[in-house]
């Protein structure tokens, strides 16, 4: 019978099952965590008196058998095994409290939840995300500088152990998370804040009252709104949250087209209300800032449509479904000619975060990627600075498999951009800059995924 394990075993990292039961092992080395793909681990019928805390890092485990050993205590790190379905503990001299919990109905899940909720959290605080300056302001050019924040706060309704089993229940609780969320918002101190997944009750009880004290006006309404600034120029700020299911890329693309079609109508009404004071009837003449959780990756049809001004009618994201006739109704440049074969819009938009600056804005166990965006009218604005990403090494060093986390209150990271708004073209030879004083603006996206609610 085996008394010790060879270190070469930890190099076989592709293993998904390991049977080392019925041996004379008295300890399991911490290096067992170097087998990250293990789904099944049988350590039963050995002479184990303790388990390494690193066993809790093996979050792929579905079955862990520890029957008939000499275990008196269990490391609380086992609570991190949120995908574990079977935990074998029979035949161990464990404390009666542990055994009582384990022997209850759904005892494995209750025991793991208990250990996770009582696992000590490392006191190290979240490191500061870097500020990235892209350009300096030219004092000779009369432009307006303002900051825009986009943040999906993860509503309380969706913050469940079923969806986020790797997070302690106390750290999922809204009373705990709201403190970190407000700290994030107030630390960024943006001129314009766009929030997604805001519940009605929390809007009135938390966001509206707290942010009013800091000089913000709040909007919680069924459509995007524009706000005139000093009577000089309109700026249209829109906030959206698209459908979440990755299987329905066609739905997201159509939602986005409907969204821009509605923005076009809002811009046209704004220009009409300005009467003869407007030099143009082109809706794209109004600067636009679009903040959104698009639930779409940078290579998606949704982002292509926004960035390039259109997509082909036969784009793969339509999944070969026949949307042709319906789609022409959402072309912001009117019905397309048959030779065009594209659905287009006239807004010249650009994403503030370009390239691979952010590897992810949504960070969960099952998914890590960029799905949150700040778009702006590139003919009217430019980016002067951005809030950079959280250091990836901090996440890996602290074995954070997903968010939320006791130090991270949402499954999304906020975006913050410093935009430079160029002065509008006027009939006068002099240029008028745009001043953005307090009150600031906070736009809150209600809980539904209706793209018009912003």
Report each predicted region and the residues it spans:
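The feature encodes a structural signal of leucine-rich repeats
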Residues: 5-8, 28-30, 51-53, 74-77, ...
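Leucine-rich repeat
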Residues: 10-14, 33-37, 56-60, 80-84, ...
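Conserved hydrophobic beta-strand positions in leucine-rich repeat
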Residues: 15-20, 38-43, 64-66, 87-89
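Metal-dependent phosphoester-hydrolase catalytic domains
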Residues: 76, 96, 111, 122, ...
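Beta-strand-turn-beta hairpins that frame and shape the catalytic cleft
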Residues: 139-148, 157, 228-241, 381, ...
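Acidic/histidine-rich helix-loop elements
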Residues: 154-175, 246
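Active-site surface patch of divalent metal-dependent phosphodiester/phosphate bond hydrolases
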Residues: 167-230, 307-311, 374
């Amino acid at each position: 019978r085996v008394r010790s394990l060879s270190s070469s075993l930890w190099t076989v990292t592709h293993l998904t099952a390991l049977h080392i039961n019925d041996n004379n092992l008295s300890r399991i080395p911490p290096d067992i965590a170097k087998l990250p793909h293990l789904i099944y681990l049988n350590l039963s019928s050995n002479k184990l008196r303790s388990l390494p805390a690193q066993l809790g890092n093996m979050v792929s485990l579905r079955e862990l058998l520890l029957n008939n050993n000499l275990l008196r205590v269990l490391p609380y790190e086992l609570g991190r095994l949120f995908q574990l379905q079977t935990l074998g503990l029979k035949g161990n001299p464990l404390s009666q409290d542990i055994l009582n919990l384990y022997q209850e109905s759904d005892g494995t899940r209750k025991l793991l939840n208990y250990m996770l909720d009582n696992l000590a959290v490392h006191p190290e605080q979240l490191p500061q995300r870097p500020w990235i300056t892209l350009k300096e302001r030219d004092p000779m050019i009369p432009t307006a500088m303002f900051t825009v924040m986009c943040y999906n706060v993860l509503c309380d309704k969706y913050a469940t152990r079923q969806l986020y089993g790797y997070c302690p229940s106390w750290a999922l609780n809204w009373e705990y998370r709201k403190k970190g969320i407000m700290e994030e918002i107030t630390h960024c101190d943006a001129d314009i804040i766009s929030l997604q997944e805001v519940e009605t009750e929390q809007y009135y009880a938390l966001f509206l009252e707290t942010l009013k004290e800091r000089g913000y006006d709040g909007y919680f309404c069924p459509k995007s709104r524009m706000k005139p600034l000093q009577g000089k120029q309109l700026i249209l700020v829109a906030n959206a949250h698209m459908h979440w299911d990755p299987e329905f890329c066609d739905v997201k693309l159509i939602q986005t087209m409907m969204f821009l079609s509605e923005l076009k109508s809002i811009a046209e009404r704004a220009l009409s209300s300005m009467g003869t004071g407007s030099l143009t009837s082109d809706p794209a003449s109004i600067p636009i800032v679009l903040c959104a959780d698009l639930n779409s990756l940078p290579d998606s049809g949704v982002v292509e449509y926004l960035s390039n001004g259109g997509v082909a009618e036969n784009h793969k994201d339509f999944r070969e479904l026949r949307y042709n006739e319906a789609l022409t109704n959402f072309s912001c440049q009117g019905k397309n000619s048959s030779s065009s074969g594209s659905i287009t819009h006239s807004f010249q938009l650009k994403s503030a975060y370009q390239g691979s600056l952010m590897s992810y804005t949504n960070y969960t166990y099952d998914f890590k990627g960029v799905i949150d965006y700040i778009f702006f009218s590139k003919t009217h604005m430019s980016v002067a600075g951005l809030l950079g990403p959280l250091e990836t090494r901090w996440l890996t060093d602290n074995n954070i498999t997903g968010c939320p986390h006791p130090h991270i209150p949402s499954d999304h990271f906020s975006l913050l951009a410093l935009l430079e708004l160029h002065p509008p073209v006027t009939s006068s030879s002099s240029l008028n800059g745009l001043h953005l004083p307090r009150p600031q603006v906070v736009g809150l996206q209600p809980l539904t995924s209706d793209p018009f609610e912003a």
